[in-house]
């Protein structure tokens, strides 16, 4: 409150008495403020000066003192105080503006004023105050200043064209300097600016300027065209100004402006003539004048007291009638924004508003408009209207309103269809204003039809999708048309309820519920308007720089509410309203895709409503404080209405099932609901089924099925009529009028009569053949099609979206048909006509597009069938129940012609049961007449196959040529037709003999009894008349069903969550993915498991069983997350993981916990499949010990491979060997055309039961792709005291039978605990591919002719100049590549996984790498990059993980520039650190083995190396060329140990697979040149006969100490070489020491021979090294399999622990349950788990029945 002087003095006296002297001065600032409030400025100034004497640097005191000086008008001192305060506290921007204003007032010529104004302009750009100051300064400079002011305004307008004040000031400058033409020109330029057109000040300025221009002498002296154009602009400006004045000003100002508008119309009326722009504009402005007059009358009633609403509403109705009957302009001369006709938009707006107001005023009043016209459409009524609008002082005769002729108007009520069309045009005129959209929605809210909100939004947002797949997100990018439509429905709904509440309190019967748009108050809240404006700004990308982030937050905040996510705070009644409106709108749409989206969103809201309905039963829903949509208690859902709403929800769910094609589910759901709506839907479904069967009904069983469906349809229709008779209220629930139901019943009864004997569908006691008269696919126009207006309209269903854009193709087909018709003009008159219909002489109503079937579009059919164009039956108006997207629409006639091309859009008749290509069902074939019969009309199809099924069409049994000539001759009985009957249509007889011919290849005639389709790629080949033919690059395989592994499981729970896993290494949670967490129950064994896949990529991120030992624990700090411990298989192998799932709400988290515990309870009722023993035998420890022994053996094997002094001697093996692998031989089949080895592996099963199996095996040469049964086990372990023996064996049975394998001496393990028989626990199973892959197509990356000089993983960035920061471009391998031909070097980088280019440019001499500041691992350079396909200068930066890699990149980069200049190749980075190697092939295997045996290389240190000798059986064939099929080898751990592999004893050879020939090493053979008698090498020639190779011995020595292992047998895969003799000895012998080459003299022939021999030996040695390399890789694979076996054993132990827990729970249940059936139900589980004897089972059964007591020990 304001203080008085007395109060200040009292307070001052009290303080001065108690405070010391310095304290008094410090409190002076406060005293000064007290005196300032008391307006004692002198005392205030005194005390503030006292305060400043002790506190001189206080900016507040200086500012306060400046204010006091300003009040005294002491400008100089005030400026000085303000300046000092600004120095002490610079952020005070307002002081800069204050100083500039004071200086401009004091002395404009002072230079300081200009300085401070410029300084303020930088701080406040675009401020009107700055503009006034600058204008004041420039005005004082005279003409020069005026020019500067003009230039400055022009420059400012260039930056801010929407600035209203600047535009007005510029026009005023023109007017003040008498430059009226320039002022008018400026008004013309600004007319396109929407911001200016919506400004009242700007429109007032335009009207004044145009009026001055018209009154000026200059204008009168100019030509008449200029005057007429200016008059046109003036009338348009008046209309716009009138609209804005009605919205923002009072009644008096609106009256004055309307009178001025009247004068302008009267002035222009005298100059009318002709059909020019002025005449058209005048006529349109006349309509706007009367419309605004009616709005002004209602505004008078809104603001007046004691208003006679009846009189005002009648006069307003007269004005609206006149405005509505003014015709729309016929010329388009004035072009507005985006090419839209300005007059056209204004006319649509006028007709829309006037029409709606007429319906609004006449609602509930019969003949209201007729009475108004009769009463006031005359001279007396015109006088009453004039007096009501204008003052009595003005002359009536000189006004437009008083002299206009209104006596010839008619009573014309607006049609709803016309209003809907006008509304769409008016939307554009108002630029998507939310006030206008809400007003239109309110008008339609009281009409029987739904508002066309979808069309309005499509008009405003052309490219916005209709629905989003990401309903759970709130990202602004996911916004769609349905979101905006729901928003508008909500705004209209709440506005309507608010208006209704106001009208109930005080409302006259003549007062309209909703006033005209310019007059009515704001219909939406500020929060709703701000959200709508933010959405429009973001979608149209008109956001001010720096403001888009704020707009995104505004949009994002409300999307959750619109989608009813999380805590939406919506009233349940609004959710119900949304669900019902969306369902009703979706039902009236033509496209099945639109129906799915609308009804799907309706289902989404119903699912949100149902939980709220349960809460309503208990208590009411709390109302939020500031909701987006206000709650109205008048529409709160009552408990008595809950059942009805639940029923509506389930009906909507069933409708969605029908739309998606799940007809059976929909029928089941509808049958469970007893209401007329479900009866109606069931009647439609069954009638559609009957119609589908009727199309192809040939056999009696089909006829009977059709009759059954018709009977069901009849029964449901009768139920509807009966319920309606007993309760009239149910009629309102029907989606169609009751008359339509009766009409449909009558038609169904007629169809049932037709099926009776003697009916028109019968001929000679049986159903008429298709040759005779049948129903055409075009139904009667009176049949059943739903429309939103609840009346039957005949409108065929539109094709899917992907086919809706083929208008050009359809036009082309029409042109072809016209051309064919012209060719047929010389033929005789066609006998084709429409077949006789059973519908009677019903006429086709207007709007029925009979030619729609001719332009049929491809519909969605079964995924395994080919794409064919189908005719959509127009029997129903795309009713959601009648034609789901997954089914095919049949026509009412069987199809006779095979269509080959899908591009031509022809329709084909197909039953709903699908297609059968090239096959037929036995017993359903009927031979047809080969002679073509007469056709009635149009275009029909002829069955080429000659076979027809009752449910489908069989294609491709014979070959034929399809032409239009055949079409013209096709029969009427089996065909279908296009379009409606045209008496002038001559048909296609004899036309197009060779046009569009198709040649069909032969197909197999035999039926496939197994039910599989036999495909033939050459079944149909099209001969294109334009010689344009495209071969597919890759032949796509046959479509197969997608297998996810979840087929045999039932989904018990599914919810979207965010999954985390705990990383123990860094001790923190890591996000694993977003997706749906499912709990699946196996239908076979009943086990539940948890599965989760990531969204979009569908990668498994959780996959584990649910066990009884798992516990859910809440995550600390959150009530929406649970964590648990599980053995997870998401990465393929079992891994113990700590997982956590975060849910959206605590309710969802609690629901998950309940479902989880329910699954654990289910586990108690599941008996174990395989009881496991609970004794730990230490088997895992033994396995680990054997693995260590194997590593030790591999170390010796590595030493053997690296021996560079290998010598081979020729010795005979006299023993035939009966060891582990002695009975298993290797077959070698030489091939003259194949120089590589042809390998064949024996089958070696690893279990006794597999050895006894009688599955026969075949040679790989007989069946290269033959598959073998999947083995039940891979590993067998046996205990041994001497070591172990391992051999490579194939999983495929290729050449040996299991009977042979039984003769082998291989030791097979017999440990009981190793015999695991559960199929799901096998490792290494083999699966046949589900989809056969096409031939491999070479992928060209563009890097083929380039060497990789540098390659390393890095992160690439580019500099964005617009935002001034670095942006990440991708992570991947950055490469430096050099072209082999031109030596050019470039940098290429692709992103990981997606392989998208993110860098691609040449390295030029002027490029240089520079370090980024702050790090030495980042290099920066500038280049002309082509990563996006176009040349673009980019500033790039690459970051490496290690410093040495970054340095290497810099080094190679610099070398690349030098190499380009010298035209030389660069040494690749990867090979620089490598040293020259003698044997480049074998070292890789050594490195792998070295890594494997690194831990135990110190165990064996001797120099002994095992020698190997083996025996081989060679069988040669000379004709067939074969390919080897090698299956993955397996390990067999038998009864022998390391001694049998690497020992020097002869009795323990190295058994490694099959017996091997001399020259075969470790199972891979190499053949040395044959030894002749003189010990010289000779070549090997081919022999056509089979030959046995005798076993030989192979010796390997080191440092001349040769230890032989004569009995060592090796199973070998031998290379196929040509043979010359039937028995050949393969030997390698160490050559005797020869003198060096330079000590001996040789002839030329000897040198050539030795060179040839050396070359062959080197080639063979390289082959050996390559094979050893492959061997080492196989060994690594076996070690991997061993580890997998160990992991499997660990899993068994985990499951055993779970079994113990399960047994404990079962026994506890048994003990505490009462004797009887409950106990007996647990007996099988206990018997199985404990493996009780018969005697023990009997005792337990007695206990269960209560015959014997059991004692429970009690604790003491």
Swiss-Prot record:
<dbReference type="Pfam" id="PF01465">
    <property type="entry name" value="GRIP"/>
</dbReference>
<keyword id="KW-0677">Repeat</keyword>
<dbReference type="InterPro" id="IPR045255">
    <property type="entry name" value="RanBP1-like"/>
</dbReference>
<feature type="compositionally biased region" description="Polar residues">
    <location>
        <begin position="1573"/>
        <end position="1586"/>
    </location>
</feature>
<dbReference type="GO" id="GO:0006607">
    <property type="term" value="P:NLS-bearing protein import into nucleus"/>
</dbReference>
<keyword id="KW-0597">Phosphoprotein</keyword>
<feature type="modified residue" description="Phosphoserine">
    <location>
        <position position="21"/>
    </location>
</feature>
<feature type="repeat" description="TPR 1">
    <location>
        <begin position="59"/>
        <end position="92"/>
    </location>
</feature>
<dbReference type="Pfam" id="PF00638">
    <property type="entry name" value="Ran_BP1"/>
</dbReference>
<feature type="domain" description="GRIP">
    <location>
        <begin position="1693"/>
        <end position="1743"/>
    </location>
</feature>
<dbReference type="InterPro" id="IPR011993">
    <property type="entry name" value="PH-like_dom_sf"/>
</dbReference>
<feature type="region of interest" description="Disordered">
    <location>
        <begin position="759"/>
        <end position="804"/>
    </location>
</feature>
<dbReference type="Pfam" id="PF07719">
    <property type="entry name" value="TPR_2"/>
</dbReference>
<dbReference type="InterPro" id="IPR000237">
    <property type="entry name" value="GRIP_dom"/>
</dbReference>
<feature type="repeat" description="TPR 3">
    <location>
        <begin position="647"/>
        <end position="680"/>
    </location>
</feature>
<dbReference type="GO" id="GO:0005737">
    <property type="term" value="C:cytoplasm"/>
</dbReference>
<protein>
    <recommendedName>
        <fullName>RANBP2-like and GRIP domain-containing protein 2</fullName>
    </recommendedName>
</protein>
<feature type="domain" description="RanBD1 2">
    <location>
        <begin position="1326"/>
        <end position="1462"/>
    </location>
</feature>
<keyword id="KW-0802">TPR repeat</keyword>
<dbReference type="InterPro" id="IPR011990">
    <property type="entry name" value="TPR-like_helical_dom_sf"/>
</dbReference>
<dbReference type="Pfam" id="PF16704">
    <property type="entry name" value="Rab_bind"/>
</dbReference>
<feature type="compositionally biased region" description="Low complexity">
    <location>
        <begin position="777"/>
        <end position="796"/>
    </location>
</feature>
<dbReference type="GO" id="GO:0005643">
    <property type="term" value="C:nuclear pore"/>
</dbReference>
<dbReference type="InterPro" id="IPR000156">
    <property type="entry name" value="Ran_bind_dom"/>
</dbReference>
<feature type="region of interest" description="Disordered">
    <location>
        <begin position="1573"/>
        <end position="1614"/>
    </location>
</feature>
<feature type="repeat" description="TPR 2">
    <location>
        <begin position="583"/>
        <end position="616"/>
    </location>
</feature>
<feature type="compositionally biased region" description="Polar residues">
    <location>
        <begin position="1228"/>
        <end position="1237"/>
    </location>
</feature>
<feature type="compositionally biased region" description="Acidic residues">
    <location>
        <begin position="1310"/>
        <end position="1322"/>
    </location>
</feature>
<feature type="domain" description="RanBD1 1">
    <location>
        <begin position="1029"/>
        <end position="1165"/>
    </location>
</feature>
<feature type="region of interest" description="Disordered">
    <location>
        <begin position="1299"/>
        <end position="1324"/>
    </location>
</feature>
<dbReference type="InterPro" id="IPR013105">
    <property type="entry name" value="TPR_2"/>
</dbReference>
<dbReference type="InterPro" id="IPR032023">
    <property type="entry name" value="GCC2_Rab_bind"/>
</dbReference>
<dbReference type="InterPro" id="IPR019734">
    <property type="entry name" value="TPR_rpt"/>
</dbReference>
<feature type="region of interest" description="Disordered">
    <location>
        <begin position="1206"/>
        <end position="1241"/>
    </location>
</feature>
<feature type="compositionally biased region" description="Basic and acidic residues">
    <location>
        <begin position="1587"/>
        <end position="1610"/>
    </location>
</feature>
């Amino acid at each position: 409150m304001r203080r008085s002087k007395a109060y200040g003095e009292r307070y001052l006296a009290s303080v001065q008495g108690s405070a010391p002297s310095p304290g008094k001065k410090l409190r002076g600032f406060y005293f000064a403020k007290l005196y300032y409030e008391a307006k004692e400025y002198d005392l205030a100034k005194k005390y503030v000066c006292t305060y400043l004497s002790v506190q001189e640097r206080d900016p507040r005191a200086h500012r306060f003192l400046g204010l006091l000086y300003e009040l005294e008008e002491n400008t100089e001192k005030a400026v000085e105080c303000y300046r000092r305060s600004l120095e002490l506290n610079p952020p005070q921007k307002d002081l800069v503006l204050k100083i500039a204003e004071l200086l401009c007032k004091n002395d404009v010529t002072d230079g300081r004023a200009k300085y401070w104004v410029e300084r303020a302009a930088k701080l406040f750009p675009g401020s009107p105050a700055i503009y006034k100051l600058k204008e004041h300064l420039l005005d004082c400079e005279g003409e020069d200043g005026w020019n500067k002011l003009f230039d400055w305004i022009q420059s400012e307008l260039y930056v801010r064209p929407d600035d209203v004040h600047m535009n007005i000031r510029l026009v005023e400058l023109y007017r003040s300097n008498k430059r009226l033409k320039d002022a008018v020109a400026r008004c013309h330029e600004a007319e396109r600016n929407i911001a200016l057109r919506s400004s009242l000040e700007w429109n007032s300025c335009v009207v004044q300027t145009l009026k001055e221009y018209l009154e000026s002498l200059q204008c009168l002296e100019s030509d008449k065209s200029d005057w007429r154009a200016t008059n046109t602009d003036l009338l348009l400006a008046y209309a716009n100004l009138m609209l804005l004045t009605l919205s923002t000003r009072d009644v008096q100002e609106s009256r004055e402006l309307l009178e001025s508008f009247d004068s302008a119309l009267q002035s222009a009326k005298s100059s009318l003539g002709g059909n020019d722009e002025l005449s058209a504009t005048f006529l349109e402005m006349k309509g706007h004048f009367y419309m605004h007059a009616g709005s002004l009358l209602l505004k008078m009633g809104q603001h007046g007291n004691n208003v006679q609403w009846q009189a005002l509403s009648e006069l307003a109705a007269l004005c609206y009638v006149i405005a509505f009957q003014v015709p729309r302009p016929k010329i388009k001369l004035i072009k507005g924004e985006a090419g839209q006709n300005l007059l056209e938009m204004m006319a649509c707006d006028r007709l829309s508003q006037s029409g709606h107001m007429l319906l609004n005023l006449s609602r509930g009043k019969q003949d209201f408009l007729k009475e108004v016209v009769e009463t006031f459409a005359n001279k007396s009524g015109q006088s009453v209207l004039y007096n009501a609008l204008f003052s009595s002082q003005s002359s009536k005769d000189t006004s437009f309103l008083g002299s206009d002729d209104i006596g010839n108007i008619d009573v014309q009520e607006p049609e709803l269809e016309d209003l809907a069309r006008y509304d769409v045009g008016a939307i554009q005129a108002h630029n998507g204003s939310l006030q206008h959209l809400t007003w239109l929605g309110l008008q339609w809210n009281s009409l029987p039809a739904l508002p066309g909100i979808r069309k309005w939004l499509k008009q405003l947002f052309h490219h916005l999708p209709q629905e989003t797949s990401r309903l759970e997100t709130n990202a602004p990018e996911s916004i769609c048309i349905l979101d905006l439509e729901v928003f508008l429905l909500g705004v209209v709904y709440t506005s309507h309820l608010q208006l209704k509440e106001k009208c109930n309190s005080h409302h006259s019967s003549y007062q309209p519920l909703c006033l005209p748009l310019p007059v009515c108050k704001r219909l939406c809240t500020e929060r709703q308007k701000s959200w709508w404006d933010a959405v429009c700004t973001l979608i149209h990308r008109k956001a001010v720089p720096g403001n888009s982030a704020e707009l995104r937050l505004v949009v994002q905040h409300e999307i959750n509410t619109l989608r009813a996510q999380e805590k939406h705070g919506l009233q349940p009644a609004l959710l119900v309203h949304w669900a019902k409106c969306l369902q009703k709108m979706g039902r009236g749409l033509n496209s099945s895709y639109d129906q799915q989206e609308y009804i799907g969103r309706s289902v989404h809201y119903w699912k949100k409503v149902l939980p709220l309905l349960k809460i309503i039963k208990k208590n009411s829903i709390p109302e939020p404080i500031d909701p987006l949509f206000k709650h109205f208690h008048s529409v709160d859902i009552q408990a008595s209405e809950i059942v009805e709403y639940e029923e509506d929800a389930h009906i909507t769910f069933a409708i969605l099932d029908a739309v998606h094609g799940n007809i059976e589910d929909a029928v089941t759901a509808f049958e469970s609901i007893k209401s007329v709506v479900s009866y109606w839907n069931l009647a439609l479904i069954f009638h559609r089924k009957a119609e589908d069967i009727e199309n192809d009904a040939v056999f009696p069983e089909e006829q009977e099925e059709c009759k059954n469906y018709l009977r069901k349809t009849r029964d449901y229709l009768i139920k509807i009529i009966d319920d309606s008779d007993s309760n009239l209220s149910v009629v309102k629930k029907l989606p169609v009028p009751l008359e339509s139901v009766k009409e449909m019943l009558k038609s169904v009864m007629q169809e049932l009569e037709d099926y009776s004997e003697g009916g028109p569908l019968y001929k000679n006691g049986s159903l008429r053949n298709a040759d005779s008269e049948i129903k055409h696919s075009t139904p009667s126009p009176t049949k059943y099609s739903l429309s939103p207006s609840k009346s039957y309209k005949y409108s065929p269903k539109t094709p899917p979206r992907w086919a809706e854009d083929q208008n050009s193709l359809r036009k082309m087909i029409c042109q072809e048909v016209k051309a064919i018709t012209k060719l047929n003009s010389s033929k005789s008159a066609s006998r084709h006509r429409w077949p006789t219909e059973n519908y009677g002489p019903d006429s086709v109503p207007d709007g029925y597009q009979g030619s729609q079937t001719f332009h049929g579009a491809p519909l969605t059919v079964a995924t395994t069938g080919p794409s064919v164009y189908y005719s959509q039956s127009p029997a129903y108006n795309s009713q959601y129940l009648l034609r789901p997207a997954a089914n095919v629409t049949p026509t009412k006639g069987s199809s006779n012609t095979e269509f080959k091309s899908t591009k031509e859009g022809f329709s084909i008749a197909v039953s709903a049961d699908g297609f059968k290509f090239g096959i037929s069902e036995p017993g359903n074939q009927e031979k047809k007449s080969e002679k073509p019969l007469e056709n009635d009309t149009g275009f029909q199809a002829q069955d080429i196959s000659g076979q027809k099924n009752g449910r489908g069409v069989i294609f491709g049994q014979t070959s034929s040529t399809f032409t239009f000539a055949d079409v013209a001759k096709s029969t009427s009985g089996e065909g279908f037709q296009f379009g409606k009957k045209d008496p002038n249509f001559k048909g296609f007889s004899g036309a197009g003999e060779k046009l569009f011919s198709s040649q069909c290849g032969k197909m197999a005639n035999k039926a496939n009894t197994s039910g599989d389709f036999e495909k033939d790629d050459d079944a149909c080949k099209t001969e294109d008349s334009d010689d344009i033919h495209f071969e597919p690059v890759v032949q796509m395989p046959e479509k197969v069903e997608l297998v996810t592994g979840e087929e045999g499981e039932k989904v018990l729970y599914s919810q979207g969550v965010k999954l985390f896993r705990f990383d123990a290494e860094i001790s923190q949670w890591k996000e694993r993915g977003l997706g749906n967490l499912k709990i699946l129950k196996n239908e076979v064994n009943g086990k539940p498991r948890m599965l989760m896949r990531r969204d979009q990529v569908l990668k498994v991120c959780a996959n584990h069983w649910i066990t009884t030992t798992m516990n859910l624990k809440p995550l600390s700090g959150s009530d929406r997350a649970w964590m648990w411990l599980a053995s997870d298989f998401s990465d393929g192998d079992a891994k113990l993981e700590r997982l956590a799932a975060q849910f959206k709400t605590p309710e969802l988290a609690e629901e998950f916990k309940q479902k989880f515990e329910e699954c654990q309870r289910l586990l108690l009722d599941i008996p174990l499949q395989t009881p496991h023993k609970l004794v730990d035998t230490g088997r895992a420890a033994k396995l680990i010990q054997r693995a260590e022994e194997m590593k030790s053996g591999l170390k010796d094997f590595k030493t053997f491979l690296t021996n560079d002094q290998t010598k081979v001697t020729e010795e005979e093996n006299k023993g035939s060997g009966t060891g582990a692998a002695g009975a298993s031989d290797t077959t070698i089949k030489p091939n003259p055309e194949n120089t590589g080895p042809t390998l064949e592996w024996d089958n070696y099963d690893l279990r006794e039961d597999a050895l006894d199996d009688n599955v026969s095996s075949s040679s790989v040469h007989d069946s290269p792709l033959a598959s073998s049964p999947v083995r039940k086990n891979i590993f067998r372990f046996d205990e041994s005291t001497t070591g172990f023996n391992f051999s490579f064996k194939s999983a495929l049975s290729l050449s040996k039978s299991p009977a042979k394998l039984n003769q082998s001496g291989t030791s097979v393990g017999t440990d009981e605990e190793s015999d695991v028989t559960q199929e799901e626990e096998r490792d290494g199973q083999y699966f046949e591919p589900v989809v056969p892959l096409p031939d491999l197509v070479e992928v060209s990356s563009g890097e083929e002719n380039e060497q990789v000089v540098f390659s390393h993983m890095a992160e690439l960035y580019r500099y964005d100049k617009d935002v001034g920061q670095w942006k990440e471009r991708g992570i991947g391998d950055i490469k430096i590549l050099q072209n082999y031909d031109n030596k050019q070097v470039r940098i290429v980088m692709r992103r990981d996984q997606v392989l998208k280019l993110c860098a691609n440019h040449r390295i030029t001499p002027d490029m240089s790498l520079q370090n980024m500041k702050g790090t030495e691992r980042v290099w920066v350079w500038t280049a002309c990059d082509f990563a996006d396909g176009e040349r673009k200068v980019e500033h790039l930066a690459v970051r490496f993980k290690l410093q040495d890699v970054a340095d290497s990149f810099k080094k190679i980069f610099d070398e690349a520039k030098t190499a380009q200049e010298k035209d030389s190749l660069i040494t690749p980075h990867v090979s620089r650190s490598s040293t020259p190697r003698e044997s480049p092939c074998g070292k890789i295997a050594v490195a792998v083995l070295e890594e494997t045996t690194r831990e135990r290389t110190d165990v064996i240190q001797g120099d002994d190396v095992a020698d190997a000798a083996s025996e081989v059986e060679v069988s040669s064939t000379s004709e067939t060329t074969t390919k080897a099929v090698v299956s993955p080898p397996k390990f067999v751990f038998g009864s022998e140990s390391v001694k049998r592999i690497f020992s020097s004893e002869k009795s323990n050879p190295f058994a490694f697979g099959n017996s091997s020939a001399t020259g075969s090493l470790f199972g891979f053979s190499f053949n040395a040149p044959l030894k002749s008698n003189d010990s010289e090498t000779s070549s090997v020639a081919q022999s056509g006969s089979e030959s046995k190779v005798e076993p030989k011995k192979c010796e390997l020595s080191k440092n001349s100490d040769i230890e032989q292992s004569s009995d060592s047998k090796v199973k070998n895969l031998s290379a196929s070489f040509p043979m010359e003799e039937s028995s050949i000895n393969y030997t390698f012998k160490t050559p005797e020491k020869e003198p060096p080459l330079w000590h001996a003299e040789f002839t030329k022939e000897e040198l050539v021979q030795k060179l040839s021999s050396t070359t062959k030996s080197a080639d063979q040695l390289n082959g050996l090294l390559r094979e050893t390399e492959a061997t080492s890789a196989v060994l690594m694979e076996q070690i991997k399999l061993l580890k997998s076996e160990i992991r499997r054993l660990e899993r068994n132990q985990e499951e055993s622990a779970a079994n113990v827990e399960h047994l404990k729970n079962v026994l506890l249940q048994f003990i505490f349950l009462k004797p009887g059936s409950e106990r007996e139900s647990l007996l099988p589980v206990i018997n199985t788990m404990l493996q009780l004897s018969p005697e023990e089972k009997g005792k337990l059964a007695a206990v269960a029945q209560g015959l014997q007591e059991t004692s429970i020990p009690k604790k003491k």
